[in-house]
Amino acid sequence: MSDFRVPFGPSETEFTEKRSRFIGHLLPVETEEQAREFIAQMKKKYYDARHNCWCYLIGGDTMRYGDDGEPQGTAGQPMLNVFQRENVTNVVCVVTRYFGGILLGAGGLTRAYSKSARDALVAAGVSEMRLWAMADIPCPYALFERVRGEVTALGGTVDSADYGADIRLTVSLPAENTAALRERLTELSAGGIALTVTAEAYRPGPKVEI
């Protein structure tokens, strides 16, 4: 899975369209169980509403939605489309509608549910998830500062250093930069320093406004 975005936090938004109230709730989640639990909570909280439409996306290939009594294709799917267009996953969104007595039509419903989902996403903000690599680097004392400088120059950090006959560094950096770091270390040490990637994991970045 390539880099992607997740909600920075939960949010709640509301607007009125032709006397119908649309209340949007968004929550970052990591599993379908968490998503379903949140949907159930919202349905319980807004038990007296006409509709509690929902969608969720988990990872790169798990997505579900529900129209909860609205005409097919006018609620859950348009909500889902909002997050897909923004490359956002690990999210559940529930839009509650209190009917105001005026029919909105299929087009009006689609626009209203899309707006509610997007409003909730804008309110939450997003975080860029980037694949990072963790690596070990055995480093002679004489080259420590230069090696640390190369790691930093490529957007990485030195997480720990064990001192013995040489210095064994544990570093983290964007996975896409590991090849460049390996090349720089080879040049720096005439092939004497070998970088070993020990793990990879996605990490969130700072909040980004939509």
Segments predicted by a language model, with ranges:
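Short glycine-/aliphatic-rich beta-strand segments at the starts of folded cytosolic domains
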Residues: 125-143, 169-171
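Short amphipathic alpha-helix segments
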Residues: 138-156
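Short amphipathic alpha-helices in soluble, non-transmembrane regions
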Residues: 147-152, 180-189
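Conserved short beta-strand edge segments in small beta-sheet-based binding/regulatory domains
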Residues: 157-162, 189-206
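Terminal, non-globular segments
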Residues: 171-180
